[in-house]
């Protein structure tokens, strides 16, 4: 991979003054290589290379040569950092602007896997983790029938996902449709799965075989029941058995949303208010989403809150190239704030993705992954590709390494 990246940097770098290399020829070469690799991809490394080429092709098509070389440089820097680490050299990885380096040691490049079915993944939960391998559960908010998908993920020493295997889809016994499943957790104490339904603001319990147990979390009456502003996020703390849930947006007329905690026996405990950042976009596109897309309960009792603002100017190909998603990850500490009060939030990192460079990723699912050799923890994000919209969008997996 590293030799491929370095070769690409040389190929795409500005030519000497006495040499002429046309952008169309570079575009043709990159597009041809992309087409070939898309049919030959068999590994996570191949998928990463395809992603880089996609970004380069998009930039060249827009006449942005500097933009074409940028993803190669970034990926090469990551590869060099990884190689240096393996060689015992202390090389600090480059972190996104605004990242708190006291909390984050690395933000890995996103990757996708051709053997994981394209879907509308809106939640992810760990089922069983053994070293750098683990089984995880995914929920799809536009699934034809209610259920969850089981996948197996493999990680390298840097916390990057290097392989994925689809184990299969488990339908629930309810046979429900149109429930807009947004959140999923695995209750390690009971060995059961809980699914959050945004359409009805319900959180129901199921066995790993999909059979409903009849038990449910007693959701708060103040959660709004107005379509996409309903239950969006669900998380579970394996240390104390508490559940956490919140909505994507604020109740009508309100300026804050509520994060609700639940006891291991499913009854509500305290709730805290959370203030969203002001929208970054002054003009909303034809498709616009703004709010909390996921929360993640940490072993120390804190919560990670993922704020997501997606703005798509229009549905035509030309308009869609201006699509942008801005994600900001915050940390809050309910234990240090009295219940019923507003949580103070602290920025952990930010992720911006764009359709123009083919990095567009609407991250909706988030959960903890394995613990690495140095004691750091992997945080996994998964995106909603709208079922691989028009063959362009991907179900991206991204990992952030927490200290």
Give the ranges of each region predicted by the language model.
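Sequence/structural signature of beta-propeller domains
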Residues: 58-64, 72-403
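Hydrophobic alpha-helical targeting segments used for export or membrane insertion
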Residues: 5-12
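Signal peptide processing junction and immediate N-terminal pro/mature segment
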Residues: 12-20
